[in-house]
């Protein structure tokens, strides 16, 4: 018989210790990975609920199993809130991840071998936008576009490539681009060649929900996102559209039964909570601070003589190009990590080094903002990072910085 007082600590000491260690790491490290965030205890409560027990293949009102009347309510809430949040007519909340959502779009709209125009991974795109090592690059004919010498998306190149190659789909969106995307211009290019326009807004979904970054939903045929990152919900995916029932049916079929079986109802409940949180005024204030903190960090890096790809940021992230500093991204990642500052190494445009080494680091502000960092805190943090990068290998600088990190983490806990 199951008892409510069963717990991991008493039953599985090894696993409990690992969880506790990760909890301490999150509290005592400054998190600057742009794709990470801290979700709320309410979301975690939903994910730890009895909904994890329920199998619910199908969609609300059209399930293959009985006993789904209450999980139907949960999924319907998530759908309605997602549509309200992003101004969409259609939402599918079942994808287990952003990559699964993207896969569903490919399967719904394309045939194997079709031509797709997507942002080059080396210029800020995502694996699922056509990388040769990903399903998208293996199954489809990918034509990459990139950024110009000023670090801006080259729309003239995009249009020329579209006219030349006649893609069936054009992808907007990114994993490492710090500027504003012109969704309307991209749709014009897609319409010119009769292509679908698909946007992956995973990185900026929270900013879009708050109105501090342009919304692609009115422009794209279909939009996908993750539900974590800037949206600060559970790890999962979401598909949105305003383009009519025929497309909605194709998308639903591509998710189930095309790509997945039973949905994760406990995660969908977490999504419903996160969407409700994102509709609150406080969420809009948070997202404005996310952008302000990223800008404050960029200003300090520039003042200290560092090169920022695109020269600025208009969202939550930016890339520091370390080529001129003769520091690899891998080395910078390790040095900053020694001071409890977590970043990720990242390729920069025209990077001479391999993706396993790289010449840059990607920095994001969602997590530090979530725990209460001000613009002054963000500026100081960027300065500490420059101190380490200016003095690579100097353990005294690392130890002094680590002490500052531990102090501010204690002052601004993730979960108070």
Curated annotation (Swiss-Prot):
Keyword DNA-binding among UniProt keywords: no
GO cellular component: cytosol
GO terms under biological process: glycine biosynthetic process from serine; tetrahydrofolate interconversion
Pathway: One-carbon metabolism; tetrahydrofolate interconversion; Amino-acid biosynthesis; glycine biosynthesis; glycine from L-serine: step 1/1
Names of required cofactors: pyridoxal 5'-phosphate
Annotated catalysed reactions: (6R)-5,10-methylene-5,6,7,8-tetrahydrofolate + glycine + H2O = (6S)-5,6,7,8-tetrahydrofolate + L-serine
Protein task: Catalyzes the reversible interconversion of serine and glycine with tetrahydrofolate (THF) serving as the one-carbon carrier. This reaction serves as the major source of one-carbon groups required for the biosynthesis of purines, thymidylate, methionine, and other important biomolecules. Also exhibits THF-independent aldolase activity toward beta-hydroxyamino acids, producing glycine and aldehydes, via a retro-aldol mechanism.
Subunit structure: Homodimer.
UniProt name for this protein: Serine hydroxymethyltransferase
Gene name as annotated: glyA
